[in-house]
């Protein structure tokens, strides 16, 4: 169902862009009878695709190549989670590259991470955002500019409200 939403979101985005460039009108289709027995597009896709910034790439991908992009993005989410965890470790002055690499691999390839990405790929977003939020908190505590924190809060908030709530709780506990 996530893949079908990914493909539909790409088609939906291309339709919006075509309308914008051909008629010079910004029109968001609101209802589609091909979703179940008919459903609101934005509400349905918000859970599956609209909140994930990486899913915007589906707009540029033809439907016949969507399976490749979907699989690649699933792996890329894990890669980004490992990078964000590694960045957090480097800022915390863990200078042993081998330790950080092993820690990042353990963080990414836990059973939770593998299960989530294979079943619900956008659930990997909190694994990306949490280390970045904590890194932003560390930068603010060190008196540096809060841009990383602000951008990460923005991305987490538009991605999924529930994830944002949980990330805010974990950040407050930190």
Which functions belong to the PLM regions below?
Residues 74, 79-92, 96-174:
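Membrane-embedded helix bundles of polyisoprenyl
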């Amino acid at each position: 169902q996530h893949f079908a939403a990914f493909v539909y979101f790409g088609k939906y985005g291309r339709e919006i862009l075509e309308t914008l460039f051909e008629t010079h009108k910004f029109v968001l289709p609101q209802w589609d009878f091909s979703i179940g027995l008919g459903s609101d597009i934005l509400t349905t896709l918000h859970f599956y695709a609209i909140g994930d910034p990486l899913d915007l790439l589906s707009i540029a991908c033809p439907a016949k190549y969507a399976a490749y992009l979907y699989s690649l993005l699933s792996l890329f989410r894990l890669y980004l989670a490992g990078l964000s965890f590694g960045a957090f470790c480097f800022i915390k002055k863990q200078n042993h590259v081998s330790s950080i690499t092993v820690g990042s691999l353990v963080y990414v390839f836990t059973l939770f991470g593998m299960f989530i990405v294979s079943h619900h790929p956008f659930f990997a977003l909190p694994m990306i955002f949490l280390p970045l939020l904590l890194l932003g908190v560390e930068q603010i505590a060190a008196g540096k500019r809060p841009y990383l924190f602000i951008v990460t809060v923005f991305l987490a908030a538009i991605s999924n409200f529930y994830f944002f709530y949980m990330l805010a709780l974990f950040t407050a506990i930190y």
